[in-house]
């Protein structure tokens, strides 16, 4: 009986790098991002980037804190980042989607963690992404205390990656905002968005593809790609200040589903929000998308924010003070509607 000799190439030693995972690249990334993460640190951070787990001490300024957690991604906006080579702002989008979500319950964002997954780690690209994440954390006032970089050969096409983010905040138990006190007669304030934010990009990409759009073309004085890729606005600092000075009854982060599906999430039974479309300025991007895609009006308001990134409900006597405060903090705010008693068989939010 004879046995075949092993092929000569099978005698060559294998390594993790040969299998597609570069540990050294991962370590270079950690060193690259460390100074960006350091800029986001808060006094409560006891241990951050580089350890097995991050440590965060709850501040004594809270008497009876409730932790509020949120997680989200950036969606198919990433596809446009890959195609355009613009990786520096999607990290801001990632932070915005989670911190704006937990903010609506009254929470101050405390810390943030990210998950970056790819088939082959490009250190320069990943550094740009995490630099954006750190910039978003600075805007939100929360600490970037950790994350995970997963290099998984064969899982993603070359040059592509996916992102997920996780935000944790805190709110005093007796100051949680639930929307339960909203009643007929209350006013709805809308805060301007910076663009499409991070929702509706599958439709945006379809419109671009169908019309063979030149993304470098001028669009109201800017390259169209710059307008489409504008990062999601982070509303944390102005709205935390608003909550300190004005009794806020409810807030809705206008994401997927638009005004029509997000405002009902904060309304108690028996009331409807009536919004007037002429009360705010819809950015040119949305008119362009509607025209180029032949998108129905109702569909536009179910997919996109259409110019309103956050809705705030206050009693009518506070509407002027709230608008003035927000405008003093750099926000554009309009009174966009009113709460009324719900009529038979009508939806929870109406656009007129």
UniProtKB/Swiss-Prot annotation:
Molecular function terms in GO for this entry? ATP binding; phosphoribosylamine-glycine ligase activity; phosphoribosylformylglycinamidine cyclo-ligase activity
Q: Which UniProt keywords apply?
A: ATP-binding, Cytoplasm, Ligase, Nucleotide-binding, Purine biosynthesis
Q: What class of enzyme is it?
A: ligase
One GO BP annotation is: adenine biosynthetic process
Cross-referenced Pfam families: AIRS, AIRS_C
Q: What is its main location?
A: cytoplasm
Q: Which CDD domains does its entry note?
A: PurM
The cellular location(s) given in this protein's UniProt record come to: Cytoplasm
Query: Mind telling me which GO cellular component terms the entry cites?
Result: cytosol
InterPro entries tied to this protein: PurM-like_C_dom (IPR010918), PurM-like_C_sf (IPR036676), PurM-like_N (IPR016188), PurM-like_N_sf (IPR036921), PurM_cligase (IPR004733)
* Superkingdom field: Bacteria
Q: What is its EC number?
A: 6.3.3.1
Keyword Ligase on entry? yes
**By its UniProt entry, which Gene3D superfamilies does this protein fall under?**
PurM-like C-terminal domain, PurM-like, N-terminal domain
- Specify the pathway: Purine metabolism; IMP biosynthesis via de novo pathway; 5-amino-1-(5-phospho-D-ribosyl)imidazole from N(2)-formyl-N(1)-(5-phospho-D-ribosyl)glycinamide: step 2/2
Query: What are the disulphide bonds in this sequence?
Result: none
Q: Catalyses which reaction?
A: 2-formamido-N(1)-(5-O-phospho-beta-D-ribosyl)acetamidine + ATP = 5-amino-1-(5-phospho-beta-D-ribosyl)imidazole + ADP + phosphate + H(+)
To which protein family does this belong? Answer: Belongs to the AIR synthase family.
- Protein name as catalogued: Phosphoribosylformylglycinamidine cyclo-ligase
* Provenance organism: Nitrosospira multiformis (strain ATCC 25196 / NCIMB 11849 / C 71)
Q: Report which gene this protein is encoded by.
A: purM
């Amino acid at each position: 009986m004879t046995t075949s000799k092993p092929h000569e190439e099978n005698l060559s030693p294998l390594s993790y790098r040969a299998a597609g995972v570069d540990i050294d690249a991962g370590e270079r990334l950690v060193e690259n991002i460390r100074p960006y993460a350091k800029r986001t640190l808060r006094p409560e951070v006891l241990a951050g980037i580089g350890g097995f787990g991050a440590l965060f001490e709850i501040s004594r300024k809270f008497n009876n804190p409730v932790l509020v957690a949120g997680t989200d991604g950036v969606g198919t906006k990433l596809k446009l980042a890959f195609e355009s080579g613009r990786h520096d702002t999607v990290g801001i989008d990632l932070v915005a989607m989670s911190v704006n979500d937990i903010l609506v319950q009254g929470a101050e964002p405390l810390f943030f963690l990210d998950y970056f997954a790819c088939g082959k780690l490009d250190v320069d690209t990943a550094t740009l992404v995490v630099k954006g994440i750190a910039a978003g954390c600075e805007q939100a006032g929360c600490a970037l205390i950790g994350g995970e970089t997963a290099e998984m050969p064969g899982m993603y096409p070359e040059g592509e990656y996916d992102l997920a983010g996780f935000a944790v905040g805190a709110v005093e138990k007796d100051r949680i905002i639930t929307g339960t006190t909203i009643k007929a007669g209350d006013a709805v304030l809308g805060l301007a968005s910076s663009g499409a934010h991070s929702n509706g990009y599958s439709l945006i990409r379809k419109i671009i593809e169908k019309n063979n759009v030149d993304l470098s073309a001028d669009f109201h004085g800017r390259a169209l790609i710059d307008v489409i890729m504008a990062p999601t606005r982070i509303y944390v600092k102005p709205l935390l200040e608003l909550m300190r000075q004005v009794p806020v009854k409810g807030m809705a982060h206008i994401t997927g589903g638009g005004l029509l599906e997000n405002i009902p999430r904060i309304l108690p039974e028996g009331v409807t929000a009536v919004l007037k479309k002429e009360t705010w300025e819809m950015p040119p991007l949305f008119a362009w998308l509607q025209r180029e895609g032949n998108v129905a009006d109702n569909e536009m308001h179910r997919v996109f924010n259409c110019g309103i990134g956050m809705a705030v409900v206050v009693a009518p006597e506070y509407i002027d003070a709230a608008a003035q405060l927000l405008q003093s903090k750099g926000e554009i705010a309009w009174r966009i509607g009113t709460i009324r008693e719900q009529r038979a068989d009508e939806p929870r939010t109406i656009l007129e």
